[in-house]
């Protein structure tokens, strides 16, 4: 018979596998028309032979080469794109599980509960609940893997440490491709090399920078193999004309990044903010070295205030996936202050917590998705936050400030509740479709085969597939905004500057067709406004016009189609214009 210890050793992996099973089941539910389709359409476009920067004018294309191996493998296996939506979702979940499981093994010496909570919080997170191989997910995976490699490097022999640091630099360079603003973080290792105190300790940093340089060279070699440097520079200004780019100034974005955590949890600020302020001021007033040197009664009061703020923060987290992660991170700061300096989990704080916050701040500045972009960093920071909270409660119990049972109960509560809340948000809420109870129709054809959506969306989806596959034209095709997935229904060239939400009145289209007259579409599908519109999402405030499909009827493309004598045909989902 297995001992109790052996059974407990199996509990963590068992719960991780159970969470994996639930996430794989969730992969089959809901159909997001725009975002996931856009990522796959980028890979589709490059697989067909289109050139980066020259033919595609969206900044998100930088990460598309990472999707090409997956896309090519799926086509080799299936002979087409049928079911690729579901395959991408499954691939993303499996990659995230691999990171979470490795994290569990790494943090296991800190305690089973701490390791399990940290790994589950990393596993169940998805930015805004978006499925598939988005640049959010890959950036999260690349950066998280790099942090984990650093964590391993901290306690390995010098030879292995150099290799781990090199690998960390390489994989984190890939995160920069997904979010270029992350490059600012590389200032830190460069500054470290210039410090006199760094003498004799520069090897790991140089290995890290070497890995970054090696990955950058491989990426640039691929890019310049596909497109010449002169062509890239010629078309770069058009790519930077991206209408979805943020127009907010950099100082304002940086200020918002610093204020966001306080604003998001303003209702509990009196509790958690007051506890943090008191923890910083009281040691100075009492002339002691740290909060841990204050009387037990004072420390209990500070912990109680922080826990009250934590509870309010969880209760006000609403439907936003990642807010519970931030709540735990804020509690972890308080836990750090209450823990004696010699007992603090410094390695976890340096390898996960602080880089996670930096990662989130960069996403706030570099993305137009607001606070939800920041939550990417908070999810990774939880790999350090969970050990910080666990260490605090363990120390308070050991020294008698808390009863042992109370400390264990609090540790279980504060680590389990964010996991359960985040898990519910990931499984039960949807991103740009309809509530799960309405997603009763299973798609059986095309790129989204295997997904369940509403009967209305299923009918619209089938009609779009039919409209494109039934066309006898073999020239470029253009589909209005909300159905970038439709490009995956055919191997015809893409007749648009980008597959991302292109409207009939897009200013870029006229410029694009002047640059690429051969890309003027032979088939144009103008979707009705009601087609593809979602009724439920986690963050509806991010896009004020998320369901707009075509744009103004007097836009450039509409007038040009009429001038060229294109023949319109009415379909159940909109109008198809065909070249004569």
Region roles according to the model:
Residues 131-140:
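Short acidic/glycine- and proline-prone juxtamembrane loop motifs at membrane-interface regions
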Residues 149-174, 200-210, 300-303, 348-356:
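Short hydrophobic alpha-helices at membrane interfaces in multi-pass membrane enzymes
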Residues 155, 184-224, 285-288, 398:
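Perimembrane helix-loop-helix junctions
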Residues 40-44, 55-80, 175:
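Short hydrophobic/aromatic helix or loop-helix immediately within or flanking a transmembrane segment
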Residues 58, 421-504, 522-536, 572-578:
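Short periplasmic/luminal acceptor-recognition loop of GT-C membrane glycosyltransferases, typified by
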Residues 109, 113, 144-167, 199, ...:
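Membrane-interface transmembrane helices that cradle and orient dolichyl/undecaprenyl
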Residues 98-124:
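Transmembrane-helix signature of polytopic, membrane-embedded enzymes
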Residues 127, 149, 162-180, 186-191, ...:
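Membrane-interface alpha helices of multi-pass inner-membrane proteins
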